[in-house]
Amino acid sequence: GVTLKDFAILDAKGDALKVIGAKGINMINLRTEWTGGPKSTNGAYGFYPVESEDVLIDGCVAIGASDAGIYVGQSKNIIVRNSIAQYNVAGIEIENSYYADVYDNLASHNTGGILIFDLPDLPQQGGHHIRVFDNESINNDTDNFAPEGNIVGEVPRGTGIIIMANSNVEVFNNLMSGNGTVNLSIVSYSDETDDPNYYPHPRGIQVHNNTYGPSGFDPDVGTGDLAKALFEISDGNMPDIFWDGVVPMSQMLFGQPKDEKLVMVEGEEVSFLTISPIKYMLGISSPIRTDKNEFKGVINPLEPINIEGI
C-alpha cells in the first residue's frame, strides 16, 4: 500500500493527484486547489484514484476542479470521509465503483455536491453497494464550468446529491439544503449507448432519515435536461426528492422486483415527485406522483466498508 499525507498541490496544469491500479492507497490530510476560482481551464480532477482497491480519502480538501474535486472511479472497497469539496463542478463523485462509504464530508458551493454515477463503455461498470451518510451537501451554487463534452457538464447548478444508474445505494442521515435546483435526484442514464452490458437504471435505492432544507428556489434550467424537465413537470414547484421513474419496459408493464424498488422513509414535510413513464408517453392523464408513502418500506441496511488496517 501507499500513503500520501500532509501536503498540498496547487494550480496543477492537469489532474492534481492521479493514482491508477493501486492496492491500498491512503490519501490523508491533503489539499488540491486551483487558486484562480472556478474556470474551465482548471484541471479536471483533484483527487483521482482509478482502477484501485482499498482506497481511503480522509481529511482532504478539494477546491476548483473543472470535473470532480474528489473522484473515485472503477474501484472497489472505498472510504471517503472527513473531507471538504468546494467550488468544483462535482464535489465528490463515485463512478463505476463497488463497495463505497462516503461519510462525514462537506460538499458546498459546487455545481453538484455528491454524485454516484455509473456510465457505459468502461471496463468496470454496474456500480453497487454505496453508502452516503452523515454528509452535508449544502449551498451548491456554482455555475457549471466543465469543459464542453464532459458528462458532468450536464449537472445543473444547485444539485445536492445525484444517483445515476447504480444498484444498492443507501442515502441516510445527510443534510441537504440551499441547493437551488433539487436536493436529491435519482435518475437513469438517458443518452444512447451501444454497450450491451450496461444497465442504465438505478435499482435498490434506499433513502431515509435525511434532513432537507430549502431547495428548488433557483433552478438551473439552462444546463442539461434534468432541471428543465423537472421545472416543467412540477410547474416550478420543485420537490426535495426527484425520481425520474424510468424503468425497463417490462417493469413499466408488470412492476419492479421487490429488491429493485425505491424505498423511502422520510418525514412528512419532505416533498417528492416522480413520473409514470407510460402515462407521460401516452399523455392520457397526469403522469406525476407525489405520494412518497407508496415507497415506504423496510430499510435493509448495507454492510459497512472495511479496509484492513484502517
Q: How should these model regions be labeled?
A:
Residues V2-D11, K23-G36, E53-S66, K76-A90, ...:
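Right-handed parallel beta-helix
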Residues E192, N197-I310:
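Acidic, glycine- and Ser/Thr-rich low-complexity intrinsically disordered tracts
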Residues V182, I186-V187, R203:
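Structured C-terminal portions of repeat-based eukaryotic scaffold domains
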Residues V19, V169-V171, L184:
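Hydrophobic aliphatic residue packing
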Residues D11-K18, K39-P49, G64-Y71, Y87-I94, ...:
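Extracellular beta-strand/beta-solenoid scaffold signature
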Residues I116-F117, T142, F217:
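Short, function-defining helix-loop hinge/capping sites that tune catalysis or transport
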